[in-house]
């Protein structure tokens, strides 16, 4: 005890001595300069540091317009930094953890402002205990070589195909594909079961939950030596034996999803729920419905929660992704509760019965909206003629935007500024827009293409957008088509012509309306007269020598579209009944 007391006293004296020295230094520095409030915990997180990064995959580098964002003067570990690096590799280049594990090389280099650098292996999984101050990082370069070793490529080429069949409720289905293994690969029954479950879900839509609730679920492995082994898909028990893939002849999968008689009675379970959005709760008159399948897993329950959030409050997956809070609480009748994050992809294998749930409370706190709108200048060139545009493209809300969103805005201004609609764009010779970035790069997008790019870009990185459309139309806005009218065999010369717009392709329905209009104005023949006429038709003569006869009394038209410039002339022929016949 005396020895312990002596050590404690010695340590205390040492601390007091060092503290006294520090007091003097701190007093001197405090007198020299004011307190830096940015380092205070009260102000922590309000200022950000943006660290530029580059990604090189298989020797090819890509310009990254965005940056890694950290809190200013934040001390982070190499583990946290690695998670951020893996995140941008996944989002920007689609490289997952598995790809990194199987890659030839995966590393990133941290460049510090003092001129030093540190190289970290992404495959090692070993981290130093050192912390880095985010304000000291100058840049980060990520380098991944996904090329496999030569021996791995040889292995991949030697695949072994195993045929399989699926029988559900006594009905068998021909499967054209096979289960694929590496030749002479030793696999466990657990791995084999995972493959069987995968094809059950992809081919027949049978999930793990369906298997658990099924009456029977098994598969039979038939070996080339004539033996076979039956495995229960519901047991979850696996032997330690390994199978050589080349010894398997075929696999038969058999599932009986029919419920027992006691489960056949249909019952609809209703679970009340409430939604709290940004601190404001609303009364929900409807309930979550669990019909026929009262047992559910948390993944399906989360999908139902997201559905009612979208339906009741208009909150989409995107809104949830950027929300400050997004979770729901399941209250059970036994007094227990469970909180689940809506943005989490990790679900427990537990099943929940609807009758055990008392209520569900959904809580969402959305992020603040963007304080300022963003504007991008644009130009429109139609058939080589460009006009100055005084307004800009306006982007509101999320600072990131996809090419699909830009295409919608481009179509909108084409319609508003130049009267060019979807139909004109569809038949245009050329319809593109070029996005010019501030870093000097550019990207040309076809307006008529179905853009499937998932890349998002920051509006602030766009310098301007040039829209270019070539419609192939001539300067004349309208075509004038000569026509004749013959009533009861008597034709009269018509000095005027049918005026038809060149701005778009026309249909026979459109032409019908034009013909009926001139019949009424020139000969006083109304729609009612045409209805009771013995014959009412017109013939369209095209410049290529073809012709088309159209019945004016019919409301059925061919879906063909054509240009007014292709019409040579139109002959209209109407034969009316005599008055005596008409009165009968």
From Swiss-Prot:
Keyword Signal assigned: yes
Chain coiled-coil ranges: none
Location, primary (coarse class): membrane
Cross-referenced InterPro entries: MAP_dom
Location(s) in or outside the cell: Cell membrane
PROSITE patterns: MAP
Protein name: 65 kDa membrane protein
């Amino acid at each position: 005890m005396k020895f312990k007391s002596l050590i404690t006293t010695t340590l205390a004296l040492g601390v007091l001595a060092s503290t006294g020295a520090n007091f003097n230094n701190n007093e001197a520095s405090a007198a020299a300069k004011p307190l830096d409030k940015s380092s205070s915990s009260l102000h922590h997180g309000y200022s950000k540091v943006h660290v530029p990064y580059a990604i090189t995959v298989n020797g090819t580098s890509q310009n990254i317009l965005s940056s890694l964002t950290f809190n200013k003067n934040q001390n982070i570990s190499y583990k946290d930094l690695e998670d951020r690096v893996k995140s941008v590799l996944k989002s920007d280049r689609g490289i997952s953890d598995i790809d990194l594990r199987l890659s030839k090389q995966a590393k990133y280099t941290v460049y510090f402002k003092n001129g030093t650098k540190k190289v970290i292996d992404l495959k090692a999984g070993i981290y130093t205990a050192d912390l880095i101050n985010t304000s000291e990082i100058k840049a980060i370069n990520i380098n991944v070589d996904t090329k496999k070793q030569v021996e791995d490529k040889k292995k991949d080429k030697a695949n072994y195909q195993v045929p399989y069949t699926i029988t559900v409720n006594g009905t068998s289905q021909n499967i054209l594909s096979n289960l694929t293994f590496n030749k002479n690969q030793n696999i466990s029954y657990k791995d084999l079961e995972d493959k069987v479950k995968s094809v059950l879900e992809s081919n027949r839509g049978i999930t793990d939950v369906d298997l658990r609730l099924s009456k029977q679920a098994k598969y039979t492995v038939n070996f080339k030596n004539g033996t076979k082994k039956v495995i229960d898909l519901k047991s979850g028990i696996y032997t330690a034996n390994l199978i050589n893939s080349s010894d398997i002849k075929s696999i038969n999968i058999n599932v009986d999803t029919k419920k027992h008689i006691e489960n056949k009675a249909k019952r609809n379970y209703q679970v009340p729920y409430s939604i709290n959005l940004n601190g404001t709760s609303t009364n929900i008159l409807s309930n979550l419905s669990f019909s026929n399948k009262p047992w559910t897993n948390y993944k399906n329950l989360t999908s139902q929660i997201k559905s009612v959030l979208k339906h009741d409050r208009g909150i989409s997956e995107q809104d949830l992704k950027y929300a400050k809070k997004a979770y729901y609480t399941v209250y059970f009748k036994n007094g227990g509760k469970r909180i689940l994050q809506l943005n989490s992809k990790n679900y427990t294998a537990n099943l929940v019965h609807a009758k055990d749930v008392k209520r569900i409370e959904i809580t969402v706190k959305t992020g603040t909206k963007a304080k300022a709108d963003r504007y991008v200048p644009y130009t429109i060139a139609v058939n080589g003629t460009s006009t100055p545009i005084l307004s800009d493209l306006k982007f509101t809300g999320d600072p990131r935007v996809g090419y699909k969103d830009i295409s919608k805005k481009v179509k909108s201004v084409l319609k508003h500024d130049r009267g060019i609609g979807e139909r004109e764009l569809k038949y245009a010779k050329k319809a593109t827009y070029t996005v010019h970035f501030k870093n000097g790069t550019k990207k040309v997008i076809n307006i008529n293409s179905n853009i499937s790019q998932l890349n998002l870009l920051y509006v602030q990185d766009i310098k301007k957008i040039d829209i270019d459309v070539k419609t192939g139309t001539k300067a004349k806005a309208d075509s004038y088509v000569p026509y004749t009218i013959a009533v009861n065999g008597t034709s009269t010369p018509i000095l005027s012509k049918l005026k038809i717009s060149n701005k778009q392709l026309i249909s026979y329905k459109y032409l019908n309306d034009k013909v009926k209009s001139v019949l009424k104005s020139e000969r006083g023949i109304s729609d009612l007269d045409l209805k009771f006429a013995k014959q009412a038709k017109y013939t369209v003569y095209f410049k290529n020598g073809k012709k088309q006869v159209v019945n004016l009394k019919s409301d059925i038209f061919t879906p063909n579209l054509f240009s007014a410039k292709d019409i040579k002339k139109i002959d209209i022929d109407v034969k009316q009944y005599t008055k005596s016949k008409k009165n009968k």
